[in-house]
């Protein structure tokens, strides 16, 4: 399977500085350390293999070497920091669009930070703030299952890859460079409009929502909340109808599951 190419992933007209490494513990941890050492925003780090990749709640992100997209971006959006939580929502939308542009799939967004295809997780995102000597920065980590065919038993019913989702198409593999480049191009555009363009984007996020209308169980600050996902507000918060008839917005959650 072809290795990732930094020269192909780079787009000269955009401010990204793309690097590709063979193996690393975690691309997000590496960028956090780079930021603390004085690295400027715009660095994007792809890895063919991660030995300590992670998602929310420190869950490990496992992927076979050279098959998927595992990368992180070091960001400093020009908008006030109050708008930075929007980055994860915009990135999920970008991933959906990039997949749809390349493949005959209709990805959906599972609030707050996953992308689903055929009711299974195909991508996860994690944004973390880091305080540096030059001010606040953001590390956005993205894991996208592209060419993985086999998953561990504990994930086989809940995870998928793009290649698995488009079978029986004849390709032996999907082009990771093309998909990664498309994500970087669209992500730059969306982040540049994080302040004034978000309300337009959130309408599409609603249309792509996997959760809306479902009964869910969310873990928020260690406690469980049950309810029906009604809507997303203009900031991308989940509006939940509770069993007692009250309505509550959730700005984040450690875990969200559908209640069958």
Question: Language-model segments: what does each one mean?
Answer:
Residues 1-101, 173, 260:
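N-terminal lobe of the biotin/lipoate ligase/transferase fold
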Residues 3, 13-14, 79, 85-107, ...:
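Long, positively charged amphipathic alpha-helical accessory segments at protein N-termini or as interdomain linkers
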Residues 114:
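Conserved active-site carboxylates
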